[in-house]
Amino acid sequence: MKLNKWVSVGVATITLSMLSVSTPALASGDGQSTQTSDSTENQTQTQTSNHTNQSHSQWQKNLTGEAHTTIAHRGASGYAPEHTFNAYDKSHKELGASYIEIDLQRTKDGHLVAMHDETVDRTTNGHGRVEDYTLAELKKLDAGSWFNKQHPDLAKSEYNNAKVPTLDEILSRYGKNANYYIETKSPDVYPGMENQLIQSLNKHGMLTDQSLKNGHVIVQSFSEPSLQKMKQLNPNIPLIRLLDKGELPFQSEADLKRIKSYAVGVGPEYTDLNEKNTKHLKDLGFLIHPFTVNEEADMQRLNDYGIDGVFTNYADKYLSLIHIS
């Protein structure tokens, strides 16, 4: 059965539906019949509301304790060059996002670095694949000037010649004062990157029972094998299965059960979510963190559906919305 065909109907809802059909006939009788109908319908509505509230209270909650978590997509990438300390500092220190989101690639000499693409062309003045650069060579590239050229209204001189950070540098800079939402990007290109990620997180004290309990680290991936490997290496790390655009509607019950066996949540492309499939995912015990949500109207609509947070380039927009709500 496909996700976009699920319908969840409670007993209380069926009762209310039946009463609403019979009410007009009752209303045409004497006042006592109308009063009885109104009383019964109000009681049924209360039962329905209580049933819904009880169901919602059992839904999976963010480990940070927040009703809605704000994931700074590649840092504050709407305001600063993505995956640079400029973007991370702004999202963490200035905007107050819940998580710094980090995409991982690996250099020729084995260093995990923060970069979305497998090539350096889009976000630096270099050319070629990350895996063909040593860390020293990668550090010579300018990872910020492109942003000033594309966004002259947001340009800052400090962005010029920004550097590509390593995972270790990021963890050293923010330590346990930040939360990290880390993606194993292109794990097929970088075999063994899961082991390296575990080693780095251990080195920086991010895999203690307390850190994991409080959601200081979440690992995400589009790759099921990569997440399953992470689960084998450390079964206590919260994992999120990312679902590309158009992928969510084709997940069967068996698919979702399999995902739930290793992941605490899913990160679907946000336009694939609707009220029904959001509720079904929540009823199955998933956290739901859709990507990449940059418009306030979409943020509000998704919150109304029942999601638990968003990936966004504009953490300030989402934070303002959830603080007002």
Predicted regions, residues:
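Phosphate-group recognition and catalysis centered on beta-loop-alpha active-site segments
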Residues: 3-12, 17-325
